[in-house]
């Protein structure tokens, strides 16, 4: 999908780019599949900030997405391709022959009128969903489960995918390679959808001005060196002062660079064949 640029009529428009939304077929979502989304602004149930730089943003309705793809052996037809304000991937509305409607993530190359199906084993066709143990080697996948029946958790953002590498001798586990370069094992009973997620040019968008990020609910990221010493380890000093420590620090006084952040006690560590590449 092409990237749209703008004439520099204002300073913020000079380098600003946008996605070309001509691929979308409607701007009206299916009413039965939307609900109100409450804002949390990065706070938990006690009001404590757990994720910084979140808050504000335009009011949006949540689209109920079918990540489980558990409607087996019933053919569905792609009715629309739509924008979803809650994610960077597009979504498409699927009309099943039994009358039910569901939203799914829109894979790359999907078109209105195409037919898709979910089953234990089916054709290797973009949009079809099946169990990993029945997928041939080398297949590109998205919306991949980590636990059978829980719903897709991996490769759900725009342009992302995982590659199917092979199966164990006993068939219990399969091996996949993630976009990060990590190679890991997943249960063969888990499901995944064929193809990669669409809207792959999303990463190339230049937002142009701070205000566009505010519309998205993203607040400013303040440099530690611009803070006071009681707010950040880099803060304080006269004028532009250096860090003043051996290494850059996080706001909580831990080393910011080159430190492994994964919990060593995680049970799934034994399933990782090769760590992600930096």
From Swiss-Prot:
Residue span of region Disordered: 223-278
The UniProt regions of compositional bias labelled Basic residues, in chain numbering, are: 261-278
| Role | One of the primary rRNA binding proteins. Required for association of the 30S and 50S subunits to form the 70S ribosome, for tRNA binding and peptide bond formation. It has been suggested to have peptidyltransferase activity; this is somewhat controversial. Makes several contacts with the 16S rRNA in the 70S ribosome.
| Origin organism lineage | Bacteria, Bacillati, Mycoplasmatota, Mollicutes, Entomoplasmatales
HAMAP family reported for this sequence: Ribosomal_uL2_B
* Protein name as annotated: Large ribosomal subunit protein uL2
The primary gene name is rplB
Q: Name one molecular function that GO assigns to this entry.
A: transferase activity
Q: Name one GO biological process term.
A: cytoplasmic translation
Keywords tagged on the record: Ribonucleoprotein, Ribosomal protein, RNA-binding, rRNA-binding
């Amino acid at each position: 999908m092409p990237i749209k640029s703008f004439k520099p009529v204002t300073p913020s428009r000079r380098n600003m780019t946008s996605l070309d939304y001509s691929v979308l077929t409607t701007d009206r979502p299916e009413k039965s599949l939307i609900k109100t989304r409450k804002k949390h602004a990065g706070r938990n149930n006690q009001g404590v900030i757990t994720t910084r730089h979140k808050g504000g943003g335009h009011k949006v309705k949540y689209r109920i997405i079918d990540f489980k793809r558990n409607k087996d052996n019933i053919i569905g037809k792609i009715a629309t391709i739509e924008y979803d304000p809650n994610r960077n991937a597009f979504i498409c509305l699927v009309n099943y022959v039994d009358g039910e409607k569901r939203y799914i993530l829109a894979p790359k190359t999907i078109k209105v009128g195409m037919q898709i199906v979910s089953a234990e084993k089916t054709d290797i066709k973009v949009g079809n969903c099946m169990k990993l143990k029945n997928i041939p080697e080398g297949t590109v996948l998205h919306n991949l489960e980590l636990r059978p029946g829980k719903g897709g958790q991996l490769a759900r953002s725009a342009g992302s995918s995982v590659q199917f590498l092979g199966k164990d001798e006993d068939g219990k586990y399969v091996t996949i390679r993630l976009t990060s370069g990590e190679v890991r094992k997943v249960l063969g009973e888990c499901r995944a959808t064929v193809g990669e997620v669409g809207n792959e040019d999303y990463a190339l968008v230049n937002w142009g001005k701070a205000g566009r990020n505010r519309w998205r609910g993203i607040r400013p990221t303040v440099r530690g060196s611009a803070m006071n010493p009681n707010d950040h380890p880099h803060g304080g000093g006269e004028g532009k002062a250096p860090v003043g420590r051996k290494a850059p620090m996080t706001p909580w006084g831990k080393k910011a660079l080159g430190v492994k952040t994964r919990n060593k006690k995680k049970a799934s560590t034994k399933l990782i064949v090769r760590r992600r590449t930096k």
